[in-house]
């Protein structure tokens, strides 16, 4: 079975963790679309996000406590759901499930650990589907 291609959504505050996670997934052979690797100078970020998502099998949404205030998150979540993509959210430890947006809360999500451990858990979950 081919490994599914994933697109990673994150905020600037989580860029280091997201980069490490993207690299850990790549090290496991999972094809990854990640803005820092795949958006080039002069490109429309929104167009690149949409293109990356269209070419992916799943969206991995890295959430933080302020995610509700970030419109790009909802653009990406809505687009992924509308395209019929699998959506896997990664939330910080100790997150109150009631604080999560309904489209996140109503799907099984992962609790953030080290980028390497989370990438292992994520790649195993994607292959099991």
Model-derived features with residue positions:
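Short acidic-hydrophobic, aromatic-tinged amphipathic segments that line or gate anion-handling sites
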Residues: 109-114
């Amino acid at each position: 079975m081919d490994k599914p291609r994933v697109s990673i959504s994150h905020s600037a505050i989580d860029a280091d963790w997201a980069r490490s996670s993207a690299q850990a997934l790549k090290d496991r052979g999972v094809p990854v679309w990640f803005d820092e690797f795949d958006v080039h100078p002069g490109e429309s970020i929104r167009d690149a996000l949409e293109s990356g998502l269209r070419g992916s099998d799943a969206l991995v949404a890295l959430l933080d406590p302020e995610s509700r205030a970030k419109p790009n998150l909802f653009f990406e979540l809505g687009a992924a759901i509308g395209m019929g993509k699998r959506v896997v959210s990664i939330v910080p430890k100790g997150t109150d499930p009631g604080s999560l947006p309904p489209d996140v809360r109503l799907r099984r999500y992962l609790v953030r650990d080290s980028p390497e451990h989370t990438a292992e858990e994520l790649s195993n979950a994607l292959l099991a589907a």
